[in-house]
Structure formats: structure tokens, C-alpha cells
From Swiss-Prot:
Residues 316-326 have a biased composition (Low complexity). Signal peptide: none annotated. It comes from the Eukaryota. This is Muscleblind-like protein 3. The keyword tRNA-binding does not apply. Keywords: Cytoplasm, Developmental protein, Metal-binding, mRNA processing, mRNA splicing, Nucleus, Repeat, Zinc, Zinc-finger. It comes from Mus musculus. It is found in: Nucleus; Cytoplasm. Gene3D superfamilies: 3.30.1370.210. Residues 316-342 are annotated as: Disordered. Residues 333-342 have a biased composition (Polar residues). The keyword Kinase does not apply. One of its GO terms (cellular component) is cytosol.
């Protein structure tokens, strides 16, 4: 299986801006640099009330004479830059999770290619397994220890699967705050330093689609130097809330990048079996240790059948009943009646 290169694909959703409807009707009283919606020229392609901003224009390198993409004004350009950074973080997280998923799939494919434990009665035709067809001989399958890695072995388990049809948790937004609806009606009894929603002083800060305001990140970091900032400056209690939400989002992203519990199981290192005659140490390379455990148990077995050259048609039963060689019989001096005595 060839490795898969996960490349970041450019997504144009974060470059999309909503077109000002009043501008389309010709009744917008705000200038291009003041309206929070896009005022595209006629050469730009508008689809379903939205227009795509020019990526090269954001980088300051667009050389087209009549560009079909929108060249946004500075206040919309800064908004698109924030959207681009958030989109880049999401793409990197998705790419890392995809690479992790592919690694687990490759490990599962390698594990499935291993031969399964033999449990076939027809294996009794093998002379080395004739004494018990359901138990692997302790000496079978042994390989030199130098050919295998010395570290522990990691095998893939069953990672937790998401249930279909169950909606996931709503993502936390750390760059936006919901505007207090009671404050918009003029009857909010809580002060600006007590309400958990935003009380913006400028109506142009409010996003109509979701009734929220964009947070000034420079103000939270204590370095906003704009005289009239178009972003919302939250009070101290909302700043603490935003920091807690940002910390929770980073913690969730770190947990998503980590391996899920049970995905990898650690098998302890298997010790090599030293040979008494000084030969190369060997051990059983099976994934599970049941064969080695059975081999170490004191199980009564039948007599050992030596491996000797057999003629065609010979069976293990004929070999077991063969007469042992004369060299193994102890010498005993005997006398017969026909022997002459001097």
C-alpha cells in the first residue's frame, strides 16, 4: 500500500462576503470603507447575494486589470484575515486526524495479514504434529531473535466509533460574543460589567446574521491603539469568560490530536529462549503468548517421535514401533549351552 500524502486544500468559504442589499438597490448611505457588507463593482461575480474576495489582493499581489473577485476595503480585509487563520487551524487539525486514521488503517491491514492460529484436524498428516493436532509443537515457528525488533510491540485495538445520528457538541467561538437582546430593546437591568452578553455602544459592530459582535483580540492582549476601534472591547468579566473558553478549546483540540483510549495496546517485550548449547537465542514470534504458555506447562505428552529418514509409505505409527539401534542396548555377557569351556 502506497503512503498517502495529505495536502491542505484551499477552501474559498472563508473568502466569501455577503453583499450589501441596500447597495444592490442603490440606496446604501454608507461608503465602501464604512459599510460592514461588501460593495462589489460590476465586474465581480455575485452569486446568491455573496461574493468571493480576491486572495491575491489580500497578499497585495493581484495584477489583474478587471479582477472578477472582490478587492475588499481595509476593514473587511482584516475580518477575512481572522477567518483565514481560523480556517487554517481547522485544516491542520483535520489533516492530522486524517493522517492518524490512515496510520491505524495501515496497522490493521498488517495485523490482518498474519496467519491465524492453526485449528485444523487435517494437520495430523504432518509428522511433527502427529502426536496432538490441536497443539502447536513448542519448537515450531521459532526464528532467531536478531531478526525481530527488541522494543515492545504495539497492536491496534478498536477505537471508539461515533454513533450515527447523534449531533456533536456545538463549537465554542472565542472571537465573537452574543449581543444582549434586552440591551437592544433598552430594558436590560444589568450593567455592562455584570451582564454575560455584550453591550456594544456602536450599532455597526453587530453582525445581523447571528446577532453577535467580533472581539478585539488586541484589546484583550492589552495592545489596541486604535482611536475608534470597529471591534468590541469586552469588560473584564467577559474577558475572563473568553480566556476560559479559549483554554477549553485548546484542551479539546489537544485531546482530539492524541490517540484515543484503547487504540493502541502495549504488549510487553517477549524474552528470548537461551539455548543450552550456545546456539542463537530464539523465541516464538506469535502475537499471543498462548502457545509459549502451553509449551512451558508440564503437560503429559506421548513419547517423543524422533525425526528420521522414512521410506515412501511409512507412517508415524511404524516409526514409533521400530526397533531401537543396537548401540542403545547395554552389553551383557551371556553363555549358552553349546559354548565350549576350557
Amino acid at each position: 500500500m502506497t503512503p498517502v500524502n495529505v495536502a491542505l486544500i484551499r477552501d474559498t468559504k472563508w473568502l466569501t462576503l455577503e453583499v450589501c442589499r441596500e447597495f444592490q438597490r442603490g440606496t446604501c448611505s454608507r461608503a465602501d470603507a464604512e459599510c460592514r457588507f461588501a460593495h462589489p463593482p460590476r465586474v465581480c461575480h455575485v452569486e446568491n447575494g455573496r461574493v468571493v474576495a480576491c486572495f491575491d489582493s489580500l497578499k497585495g499581489r493581484c495584477t489583474r486589470e478587471n479582477c472578477k473577485y472582490l478587492h475588499p476595503p481595509p476593514h473587511l480585509k482584516s475580518q477575512l484575515e481572522v477567518n483565514g487563520r481560523n480556517n487554517l487551524i481547522q485544516q491542520k487539525t483535520a489533516a492530522a486526524m486524517f493522517a492518524q486514521h490512515m496510520q491505524l488503517m495501515l496497522q490493521n491491514a498488517q495485523m490482518s495479514s498474519l496467519a491465524s492460529f492453526p485449528m485444523n484436524p487435517s494437520l495430523a498428516a504432518n509428522p511433527a504434529m502427529a502426536f496432538n493436532p490441536y497443539m502447536t509443537h513448542p519448537g515450531m515457528g521459532l526464528v532467531p531473535a536478531e531478526l525481530l525488533p527488541n522494543g515492545p510491540v504495539l497492536i491496534s485495538g478498536n477505537p471508539p466509533l461515533a454513533l450515527p445520528g447523534v449531533p456533536g457538541p456545538k463549537p465554542i467561538r472565542t472571537d465573537r460574543l452574543e449581543v444582549c437582546r434586552e440591551f437592544q430593546r433598552g430594558n436590560c437591568t444589568r450593567g455592562e460589567s455584570e451582564c454575560r452578553y455584550a453591550h456594544p455602544t456602536d450599532v455597526s459592530m453587530i453582525e445581523v446574521t447571528d446577532n453577535s459582535v467580533t472581539i478585539c483580540m488586541d484589546y484583550i492582549k492589552g495592545r489596541c491603539s486604535r482611536e475608534k476601534c470597529k471591534y468590541f472591547h469586552p469588560p473584564p468579566h467577559l474577558q475572563a469568560k473568553l480566556r476560559a473558553a479559549h483554554h477549553q478549546m485548546n484542551h479539546s483540540a489537544a485531546n482530539a490530536m492524541a490517540l484515543p483510549h484503547g487504540a493502541l495496546q502495549l504488549i510487553p517485550k517477549r524474552s528470548a529462549l537461551d539455548k543450552a548449547n550456545g546456539a542463537t537465542p530464539v523465541f516464538n514470534p506469535s502475537v499471543f503468548h498462548c502457545q509459549q504458555a502451553l509449551a512451558n506447562m508440564q503437560i503429559p505428552q506421548q513419547a517423543f517421535i524422533p525425526t528420521v529418514p522414512m521410506m515412501h509409505g511409512a507412517t508415524p505409527s511404524t516409526v514409533s514401533t521400530a526397533t531401537p539401534p543396537a548401540s542403545n542396548v547395554p552389553y551383557v555377557p551371556t553363555t549358552t549351552g553349546n559354548q565350549l569351556k576350557y
